[in-house]
């Protein structure tokens, strides 16, 4: 059941009941909960608004600051804000913090009303069509009740759309200070047009609706400034730093990531000439991120659970139970900034807070120094002027062949030697690689005296899902004065990927549950089992296998009660059987239903999906009871799902195999294949008697093509030559190749297609092609298809280097890639 399907079943008329059955690991059986439906309006401000106390300090009286977190802009946002402002007015707060971090947006008119609540005059936002046509300005109205205290708006990369409208209005009308990260950058307007479908897609009238979402306009913030692609740049940018160590692994992040995902990072994003590209924040404050004890605060962009990048972390550091009183650096920082503010105007507020900002920077810098000192790094600061240091940097692997196996730890060693005459302070190296597991990792050396060398060993976890690839790692060297030129070498490392699993499966629908007549067919009102046996036909083991059965899209009347199973490892050639259970309701409409089956190794990312269609049979007689045994009298006798020559073949039995008999229907006899299932065999293919022995050979109904691809991992030139072979027990319909390069910021390119036109035998095909490449690492995906649903995939990562061995310059995203060769006939 998908989330949407669950929502559809939960929704209903107010004051009606819905039963929810919950299964827990800690409680045997299933527990029933009856819920009375009601009209639910999630609060826009959550947790509730509160007042933060600021104690008195040197030269500063005690103060109160109001705080609220606007989660989204919904129909009740303005109303919830009105209640919060009433609280702040009663408490006589000196400033207000509006937290829009993680707010994806929402209703345009609510964003306008929230902005209007703080701003007395001016254009809050403009909606402008193509070429400036159909312009609509939303202006502030002076209600006489707008708060006049200083205002701070907290934003991050996940503040989007309506959030950016509010932040842009506050900033550009000089009403308050914006603090945090640059926002997402979505300033476009989409309109959804309903289109009637020419063909039915489901059983309900709603299933036949199609929609076209068309971009028709854009939002402009005050001053006609577009946020599209650039977002709102904060007045005070805050950068979280990380210094952590667990065992031999450390996580150092002393500068912000360049890979924060925003609108401009998506292929084919829109741009506008009024967007302020290159705008910088007025101030920058870095702070040490301090996770709560026991929290896993590290995970890199590759998805490795053990390595979290700073930008992926929850800055609050609080659990859900603590949300009513949550706090973090940004909230504390904004609270103290507003408490000492002498003006509510944005520019005056920031310019008048220089001393406060310097104090915060010094305190956070001290925290970083102390954290690094615990790791044995001298992070003391040196003089700000004088002669620049001269340094040499060497990167080297800790293994002789620089080969790393996927799923293990990679160890890289950096050595910096001071070959100059002056000491170098706060020396660190930042790695640069197309592979996110290496990219932006930092090696920290600290103070290095003249003639001294210092080393740092970086340990990273290479995910088990990594493909075989060669990665080039470069490093930029920084000192207290910024980036420095340093003689050194780049490093090539080879990752050896694991052999991948591949899944085949056979299934059988068995009507032996509640309300079933055991004729092997599915009738309305029956509860049935779908027995799915999965075989790993690949070379490598599956590390964590999941099998999921879902209802067909928009389909009602099929209720799945057991639809998800897990298995840990599935070795090559090993099989595993899953027993799904579902019910066909008596009111099901139609003569056929569809089920979506997915089998996946969630660790390695290999999967198989298929759509299974099952016909509804008319009500018929139950099989006649029969006892005894039967011996198979022909070679590879087909055993079927039901009693009929056109029924699905679920397996074959060799001549001489003996089964126990349990029923008879027409010209077929039901035999017990094993303790968990039965099947039907033609009575003409058996004779009575015999001692039970032998077993069923499964009939694999879905086996994706076997695919082998040969390609180098490093090339010099504009393309890579690949060749391969695909084979299947039924059909290899075609082969196609896609290529993608993360840094090129272009859509995935379909670079090659070859249909199988072999005369006679279409169960195999050879192919070869020249695939275009871009600078750096290219993900080349080769697909071999049996059908639209059943296909196999092999991924090759190819590093494109310049003739001198360096990474060639990355072209502009607008540049065209090398032309792909024509498909081979």
Where is each model-derived feature located?
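C-terminal "post-core" interaction segments
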Residues: 14, 28-33, 41-386
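Surface-exposed, short loops/turns at beta-strand junctions within beta-sandwich domains
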Residues: 14, 466-468, 586-590, 770-777
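Short, compositionally biased P/S/T/A/G/V-rich stretches that sit at domain boundaries
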Residues: 381-402, 503-521, 688-715, 801-825
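Intrinsically disordered, low-complexity Pro/Gly/Ser/Thr-rich segments with frequent PxxP/GP/PP motifs
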Residues: 436-466, 557-587
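Long, low-complexity serine/threonine/glycine- and acidic-rich segments characteristic of extracellular
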Residues: 446-462, 568-571, 575, 703-720, ...
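Terminal connector regions
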Residues: 462-501, 583-620
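Boundary regions of SH3-family modules and the immediately adjacent low-complexity/disordered segments
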Residues: 615-624, 672-702
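SH3/SH3-like beta-barrel superfamily modules
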Residues: 651-682
